[in-house]
Amino acid sequence: MATSLAAQLAQIAAKSRSSLNVKAQKAAHTKSLIFEPRIAAGQSYQTIYTACRDGFEELCQLDARFTPFSNTLFSEQSQDEDRSQMTQAENKELDRRVDSFLRLVGSRLRLMPAIKAIEWLIRRFRIHEFNTSTLLATFLPYHSIPAFVTLLSILPADLPQQYKFLAPYVRSLTAPPRAAIVYQATHHREFLTAITEYTLDACRNKQQYPALVSFWAGVMTEAVNGRIDINRSGRQGVQLDNDLALIALVSKPLGDAMTMKDVPDIQIAAYMVVSLLAAKANFDDKLLSVFMEQLVIGWTAETVRPGLVCLSILAQYRAPKQLSSRVAKALLKMDDLPQRLVDASKQCRVDKLAYALVLALADRLAKKGDARGLPIIKSILLLELLQEKLGKVAFKSLLRAALKMTDEVDQDGSARKQLGSTLVLLSQSAGATGVMVRQVIEDEDYDIEGLELRLDTSFGPRRLLEDKPAEEDAKDLEVRQDPKETLEAAIERLAVPPRSVKSFLSQKSDQLFDDMCKVLLSVATDPDDLLKFDEAPFLCRQTAHDDSYYFSFYMRVWCGPYPTLIRSAALEMAKRRLKQGDCAALDLQAMIPYCVAALSDPAKKVRQAAADLITVLSKSNAEGIETAKRPIWASKQLYEQSNEQTWMNPAASRALLQEIIVPALEESVLDEEHISNVLRSHLQSTKDSATGPQLSSAVRLSIFSCITSHVVHTPLLAVKSRLLKPTNQVDSVSKATRTSLLLPLLRWWASLSSTEAAQLCERERIDESKFNQSCVNVAVANDKPGLETLFEIITNSSAWTREGLVEAAFARTRKIWSTIKSDSKLKLALSMLDLAQTPATAGSSAEFVSEEAADFLRNVDLTTNILNAFLESLQDIPKITTDSPATKRRRTSSSDHSRGVSLQATNAVKAALNKVTFVLQLVEGSKPAEHPELLQSLFVTLADLQVLRSQVGSELGYLQNLVLSSLLAMMPTYKNNKSLKIDTSVGHGDVLVQCIQKSSSPAVQNSALLLVASLANTAPDVVLHSVMPIFTFMGGSVLRQSDDYSAHVVVQTIKEVIPPLVETFRKSRRNLVTSAAELLSSFVIAYEHIPSHRKRDMFISLIENLGPKDFLAALVAMFVDKYGTTDSMVAFCKDLMNSFGVEVQLQSLVMLLDLVSDCLQPKPTLAATLFNRNTDDDQDLHKTALKELTLLPKVLSSRQLRTEVSQLAGRDDMEASKFRELYASLLEKILTLAETVKTNKALHARCSDTLAGLLNLLSIGEFIKAVENLLDRPSISLRQKVLRTLEVRVDQESNTDADSRTVLLAFLPQLTAVIRDSDDIAYKHTAVACVDKIAEKYGKKDLEAVAAAATTIAGDCCLGQPDKRLRVMALLCLASLVDVLQDGIVPTLPVSLPKALSYLSESLQGEKEPELHNAVYSFFESLAVHVPYMLTKTYIGQLLAVSNVSAEANMSDESSQARFGCLQLLANQVDANTMLAALEQNWAQAVNAGFSAVEEYLKLLATVLDKHPSTIIAKHISTLSTIFLSALDLRRNVQSKDTVSIAALAKLTEIEALINDVALKMIYKLNDSKFRTVFTQLMEWVATGLPKDDKLGKVLRHQSVYSFLLAFFDNLKDVVASYASYIIDDATAILKASDPSKMEDRELWQLVLKTLARCFEHDSGGFWQVPAHFEAVSGLLVEQLEHAAALGELPGGDLVQNAVVGLAEAAASRDHRKELNAAVLRRLRSPSASVRLAAVRCEQSLTDTLGEDWLEMLSEMLPYISELQDDDDEDVEKETHRWITKIEAILGESLDAMLQ
């Protein structure tokens, strides 16, 4: 029972958030988002509230929705609220407010005010404990920010179940990655549900924000995607269960999200998830349909676009069936749905959605008569949104809907009428849709005829007029609403009135025909009623052979806009009647044109019926029957003007029927266009007939005349249109043109008003535009009346209301333009120009005609005569503005008249400018190159424009550019056709100069410049006398433009103008450069204004066209003179030079040197002109010369130039020969100039630089060829410069260049000869440097030559010379040669080594010479590397001796490093025997030199010891021992001679430490037996090596030895513990004899104590436990306490204690310790207080170190301790008490009882 109760209480405690534990409460109070726990712990709620309230108020300023919380969560009262004291209802209400606030503040979490506000809720209301889920959901979208990690740090240990995945991140205090969140949402539905509910709640309360929605959408999408992948299963049952689980999880939240109309973001996010589900989840159609309905219920104007995309995706994964009524209705309400579907199709497929919509709308149409969807269906099909298969099914659904519709669902028939219009439009549409629809109509077994009757329409190619007048709609409605009339009543009604109509092909019959047609339409579907109708009296069937009444009725029907069934029935009735015998005797040719029209019917059924009719007709007109006597049927009755009708002769009638039509019947039935093609082919000339017999001209003329006559007289536009197809393709038959025969038709059609024409077309459902085209096509080019009629239509303002007809007339005229005669063309063109310039108001017919006329002129080929006439009409235009000044004066008047005149003048100017613009545009668009004769007129126009420009105050840039562009286009024609000449006397060049100079338009300037360029190339005499002002102008304008076109203009102008201009200069026999100076100056001045990316190409073009050989140098010189030798200018000049060949560049450099020489002349000629200087201004020209010379070496240093020169120099041809000549000339000139200006340092220096650059220009081989000649020159300085250049060149050469190697090695003997024979030291120096470089790079390839050079350099002629620079160079060179020759250097060493050592010694005497010093060491260093065996003991000894002096000579760091590096290398390379012997010999000298020398000596010795193995070291132990003992005697040798300073003593101590280190290095390489001998010798040496009376010497030597022993025992430790036996006697003797109060003894005394202490410390083998060893030192050591006491405050007193303690530790024997203790205790009763104090302190140390082991002898100590407690000396008493304290601490008890 107790256990159960305890468990229950534990569970309650675990779940409880209240705690009576004060520590727990304090810990909870430290949880903070902002403050550190230590700060938070000390904060009161008042403090927290004050800090957080500021943040909340800032939030209120950002968003007013936070304000209500100021009365609740952030009120003053909230400071006193405690959740633990609230009721459950109060806590629930608080949770609701907290949740609301958190959802609202989520969008501001990146702002500090939001964090502050949440801080208050955490601190006061502990929301991190009570509202953990909401708090985490609020922060989760920001899981990557630092605040989220801070939140994790304050969360309770027990997280909510859905957030337990955060536990690892809470422990590590790291932000969870997005992948972890997505994984949790994918695998744990409770987490996904939690964030979904949080997000949707925020949206419902309008508290959402983009970051939250985006986070939810991303996680939801990835989670759903992951769940789909996880749930996939091969077992259908398992897959179904998984799908149901997924549906249960996401369907409701997604449905809720999609219906939140106020939150478009969440809707779009839901669309994304739904799209994913549809694409991957394989849901059934029912669920997809539900999603579709939810989507359309909720979408808004903002979300309809993405919603439509989502809907399309859903439909795509759904079976292809119609949409639900709700979805279809929603789509039906959408504006511009087809276009939206097109837009959506760019993102996804929409075909299934469009298909399902069409099915749904068709179903609504059939069941409800709802025709609102028809426009949508029509657009979907026409826009080809459906695949062909779906499109066919969709169209079939429309046909089925049409068949299903009844009067019940469509009472007024409007829906069926709209459906019929839609079906007809689709069937007649162009493109893939029309083809597909027509195929469906033909392939499917539909009752199309019945459908046409049902819909009151016809499926054909004629366009339906969509809008009928309202009156007709009303009439149709009335008719439909009337009760249905019976056939009998109709027959009776129609038979009552008397017949006054003879033919239905007249206007008088229209009303009667309409009435009869209605009856026919009503009976067409019933064959019996149709026969009754046919035999009705009012049709006069019985008299059909006598009058035209019967047949004309049916002829009009089958050619009319009626259903196919009616049209075919009419043909059938006519055929039936023709079979009767009374028709056999008639010539029925009047019916043939109408039969031909029927054969062109779009309905195959009608064509078949027409073919049957023609077959019957042909039988009655068979050849066997006598046709000549047959009367022509209806020849007087058919038309109202039948007497004007032309009829065929019998032969022609028979030929038309039997030979043309009947053979083509079968194909005509299949193709409606076939009959027209057949007629055309037979009516054209006989030789063009495609097939069949050839017809005579008379027959063809008769047929053609008859058909065209029917076209003119028939009232049926359909018949006219169909018969015009073949006739309009026949220009003429015999002498009769189609225009002469059909012109009445065109005139009749043109005479109609727009209303009349529209009514006629509407009645017969004819496309008016096509009929207009057919009518105007009757006019042909060679028929004047036809052309005049077209002109009349175009120019007659009364016809302008027929815009379609006028447009067709323009189009026809444009089409026949090329075949119109020239005079007619000119007349027509001028008329068109007048029409194009006719003033008109906007939107008027006149404006339309004006635009058409202008368009006509723009699109026809205008002849030269026409264009010239146009231009001539412009020549008086400048006169228009001559009254402008008066006009301006009259403007000051207030009279209306003056204002009218002003306005009139302004309008006239405007009209004139419009005409000029139009004409010039026509000229430009007419390919001016094909009309070169216009050039003169265009120049006149350009001149007139200059006048007009100044008068109207406008630039007229566009007009000028039109003229200039036309002139430019003509230039190639003039250039290619030499027969065309340009008149040079007219002054075209002056006009262009004026145009260029006075125009501010860059386009005009560019065009004019291009024209100047073209003229300069084509006819230079026209413009060359005017070009200089043009170039001056270019420098200030066009050159500064940055566009590509301006750059092209400049280049083109340069290309075309400059060459002929230069040729003119050449002919003038003046200096070419001087003549062009002004031209060059204009370009140079413009340089800084030219865009940087244009400069190079433009100036290269300029130079190329001027001639680079003549002008490159001049232009570069002017650049440098004008802009100086800045980096940018030098780079530009180098670039210019590099753009040309080597020959040109060298020639230019020669010219530059000539120009510089001219500048330095007393009376310069070319330079003064070129640089525009006064010849008296010498200083200015000298500055210019300096600039030019500054440029030269920089040009010569061009890498590109060097490359080209190297390629050229290797050849042996004329070009290479020319190059060498130029090179020689350039070299000669620079040398001459250098000699001339040697008094001017600046100029001379530039000459030297130029010379160096010139010499560097050649390859090393070619260069040496030049050098060999130059070395024979008498000028030493020149030869020296050449060799210096060679040195630099060698340094630059590649090691792998075989050619360079061969040449340079071959040159070595010559350099050797220079060194040997020359008396000039500087020259020798340079030669040695050259040898050094050559040998270093290539010496190994010719050791013999290098050895010879080395011998020479080592000899007296070089190394033996007194010049120190030469010595340095020789030594450095020898060092390099050692590297090359190695053993081969040996022969020179007997000569060079003594000199080198001598020079080293000299370098340290007097004024030091570090260069020589370092050179010697460099030489020895090379020897040490390559021939160390040649360095004997003598040489090394001498070197070490001099090095000792160097070490003490205070040389620079560089010199010291050179010396020490060399010595170190010697120590490593030279044999140990030689090196150690030299070192042994050199010790005394090093000591005499100084401490630095000794220090280097010891370092060298250390290097030797490190370098050689122990076997070598052991062999030389004797030498090393000697050196070692000498080193240990250093202190005695130094201190015994003179008084030594403190600094010297310190240095001596450092050196002794170094000696000890070196000695240890030696010891490490010796075995015990070898070293014991050395050690024994050492101890003997220190003990007996000096006379007894040399006490100071002995002390100093002992100091050095014991310093070594201290290091020895300290480093080798217990390994050498036994060596202590060798020092016991000596050490005890020293301790006995030493008086530490004396400074010289005290140092040794301290060293001995330290050494003994180290021996004691490292005794691990029991050496000091041996009684003899212990007793030898124990008593003596204790006695030293008295010496330590005597020292007082002097250093060293504690050493005795350390030694005693060490001995006590090492002894490790009770007896030894007791003996030692007794000896110390005896000192406690010493009469000297200082001795007692020292003994007490010694006991303290022993007690501290040995502890209880030492206190075993406490009983012996107690009496002494007791006495010491009352010691007379206060210090002794204090130390005693301290000793007692330590004893008590160790024993753990007080000594008071023992001491009593």
UniProtKB/Swiss-Prot annotation:
InterPro entries: ARM-like (IPR011989), ARM-type_fold (IPR016024), BP28_C_dom (IPR012954), HEAT_Utp10/HEAT1 (IPR056473), U3snoRNP10_N (IPR022125), UTP10 (IPR040191). It holds the Pfam family BP28CT. GO terms for cellular component: 90S preribosome; mitochondrion; small-subunit processome; sno(s)RNA-containing ribonucleoprotein complex; t-UTP complex. Keywords: Nucleus, Repeat, Ribonucleoprotein, Ribosome biogenesis, rRNA processing. One of its GO terms (biological process) is maturation of SSU-rRNA. It is found in: Nucleus, Nucleolus. GO terms for molecular function: snoRNA binding. It comes from the Eukaryota. Residues 881-901 are annotated as: Disordered. The keyword Membrane does not apply. Component of the ribosomal small subunit (SSU) processome. Involved in nucleolar processing of pre-18S ribosomal RNA. Involved in ribosome biosynthesis. This is U3 small nucleolar RNA-associated protein 10. The gene is UTP10.
